[in-house]
Design a protein with these regions (language model features):
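Conserved phosphotransfer cores of two-component systems
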Residues: 44-46, 69-75, 96
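Alpha4 helix (beta4-alpha4-beta5 surface) of REC/receiver domains from two-component response regulators
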Residues: 64, 85-100
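C-terminal output helix
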Residues: 88, 106-116
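Conserved acidic segment of CheY-like receiver
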Residues: 2-12, 17-21, 51
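Conserved phosphotransfer microenvironments
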Residues: 52-69
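Acidic, metal-coordinating helix/loop segments flanking the phosphotransfer/catalytic sites
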Residues: 32-50
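Negatively charged, flexible loop motifs adjacent to catalytic sites
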Residues: 12, 35, 84-88
């Protein structure tokens, strides 16, 4: 079972998506945060196999957080989700250590498939 950290600033979306992921037999959201600060804190607590990070986040620093998460835990893949269409932004996050950048417009099935690709 993949244990997931989910960092997303829209709490209703984060809670609903977490609930849906928890219905899957091989996925479990074990930590959530709504900001870079909360994401860093939850990752420091440990116990996760993969992270989903929304960008942008309200307190900035998401790129540095992804870089720090990757450097501290290179075996923990980070899936970045965003509404930002700028390929340059996507490339910066991939260079920072994100395993994949996924547009937020994709279906939930595509999100699940991406998490499974990264988490197993």
């Amino acid at each position: 079972m993949a244990l997931i950290l989910f960092v997303e600033y829209h709490s209703a979306f984060r809670q609903a998506a977490s609930y849906l992921m928890d219905q899957e037999p091989d996925l479990k959201v074990v930590a959530q945060g709504g900001s870079v600060a909360e994401g860093r804190q939850r990752m420091a607590e440990g116990g996760v196999d993969a992270a989903i990070v929304d960008i942008p986040l309200p307190d900035d620093g998401a790129e540095e957080m992804v870089r720090d998460l990757h450097e501290a835990n290179p075996s923990i893949p980070v899936l970045v989700m965003t509404h930002i269409e700028d390929r340059g932004v996507h490339e910066r996050f991939l260079e920072a250590g994100a395993a994949e950048v996924l547009p937020k417009e994709v279906s939930f099935r595509e999100v699940l498939a991406a998490v499974r690709r990264l988490g197993h």
